[in-house]
Curated annotation (Swiss-Prot):
Pfam families: UPF0261 (PF06792), UPF0261_C (PF23189). Belongs to the UPF0261 family. This is UPF0261 protein mlr3387. It comes from the Bacteria. PANTHER family: UPF0261 DOMAIN PROTEIN (AFU_ORTHOLOGUE AFUA_1G10120). InterPro entries: Tobamovirus_resist_UPF0261, UPF0261, UPF0261_C, UPF0261_N.
């Protein structure tokens, strides 16, 4: 039977954990109380901290055997993530916590599939939640007061959280329409291209467009790793620029890793590889003073990538795509890679583009499965929607 997992540190938040579990059970839902504390529980639980700790690669003692609380919290987070991945009876998960508890519980939530309901009631929910949510779909709910015993406000907050998670578990989202899903990456400067492609494919595919802001690429690749995508049209690979050159919207070192691991059909291009993103002009690192910039808006400053930087970017992309055994088709628009990189545009630079294109062609190691095609077009030309035909071709393959 699928159950709602109610998770918290039963050594310090036992009263709140019991109240939340009882409120959910009162709706008729099956509940499992899960303890992720690092000391003795103060309430009965269904799954003990000792059980969770046993999932740590270093064994239970790696979590519970020391006296360093910070190390124990970090180790419990690792163990809980592995525990969550091992279960097949989770209908939904709800957690409560302060700083340590939020870190532990969300580690496990991030390991769960996208779409499975997750609510974290936390004292940290009104602050910077990016480290806890990352690219998952965790709902962060402020506890308002600290969790140091129940009071009239915390009872209301926990009651509302209980009703929310019970409702999500009882009425899951309807199944999709059966069309396979594909991921596409887009930036403002590649919008005409990606919009045209998505419009052409919607009758056959469920098109999920991701804003290439660092988190967008990670979200898309998480879906790929989760088996929720049937292919990727990665027109906008700009996040690599920020990774290599210190921009504010970077990819991670694992960019393209999901494509290599899954072997999904992949069409890629060089969208917005002419730019690195920074915030307001005053935030641009001193080493870049004197470079060519474009003020996208008062809070976003774009820097044109140089020929040497384009070589490094192209080699980084090509080397990683060379690890992909699935069908790969990389398209190069010879007349420009963004709305700014067009003849007469602020970032138009034939030399830098030529170096970029050569580096990708040289390092991607074309073979029967990996192809590179140059097109005498700008990336936003309507004809560049030949990427659609390329995707359909490799998807059939």
């Amino acid at each position: 039977m699928k159950r709602i997992y109610v998770v918290g540190t039963a050594d310090t938040k036992g009263e709140e954990l019991a109240f939340l579990a009882d409120a959910i059970a009162a709706t008729g839902a099956a509940v499992s109380r899960v303890d992720v504390g690092t000391r003795d529980a103060t309430i009965p639980v269904d799954i003990s901290a000792n059980d969770i700790a046993g999932h740590h690669p270093g064994g239970r003692d790696a979590v519970l055997g020391g006296n360093d609380r910070g190390a124990a919290v970090a180790a419990m987070g690792v163990a809980f993530a592995r525990f969550a991945q091992s279960r097949n009876d989770i209908a939904a998960m709800i957690g409560i916590g302060g700083g340590g508890g939020t870190s532990i519980v969300t580690s496990g939530m991030r390991a769960l599939p996208l779409g499975l309901p997750k609510i974290m009631v936390s004292t940290l929910a009104s602050g910077d939640t990016a480290p806890y949510v990352d690219v998952s779909d965790i709902i962060m709910m402020p506890s308002v007061t600290d969790m140091a015993g129940l009071n009239r406000l915390s009872r209301v907050v926990l009651h509302n959280a209980a009703q929310a998670i019970a409702g999500m578990a009882a009425r899951p989202a309807p199944p999709p329409d059966g069309k396979p899903s594909i991921g596409l990456t887009m930036f403002g400067v590649t919008t005409p291209c990606v919009t045209t492609i998505a419009d052409a494919l919607r009758s056959t595919y469920d098109c999920m467009v991701f804003h290439a802001t660092g988190t967008g690429g990670r979200s898309m690749e998480k879906l790929a790793d989760s088996g929720l995508l049937s292919g990727v049209i990665d027109i906008t690979t700009t996040e690599v620029c920020d990774l290599l050159l210190g921009g504010v919207l970077p990819a991670t070192e694992d960019r393209f890793g999901a494509i290599a691991r899954t072997g999904l059909p992949y069409v890629g291009s060089v969208g917005a590889l002419d730019m690195v993103n920074f915030w307001a002009p005053s935030t641009v690192p001193e080493r870049y003073r004197g470079r060519l910039f474009y003020e996208h808006n008062p809070n976003v400053t774009l820097m044109r990538t140089s020929a040497d930087e384009c070589r490094a970017i192209g080699e980084w992309i090509g080397t990683r795509l060379a690890l992909c055994d699935g069908p790969v088709h990389f398209l190069i628009p010879e007349k420009g890679v963004s709305a700014l990189d067009i003849e007469g545009g602020t970032f138009f630079d034939r030399e830098a583009d030529a170096v970029l294109f050569e580096a990708i062609e040289r390092t991607i190691k074309p073979n029967a499965n990996r192809r590179v095609t140059r097109l005498p077009l700008h990336i936003n030309d309507p004809e560049f929607a030949k990427a659609v035909a390329a995707f359909l071709d490799i998807a059939r393959h």
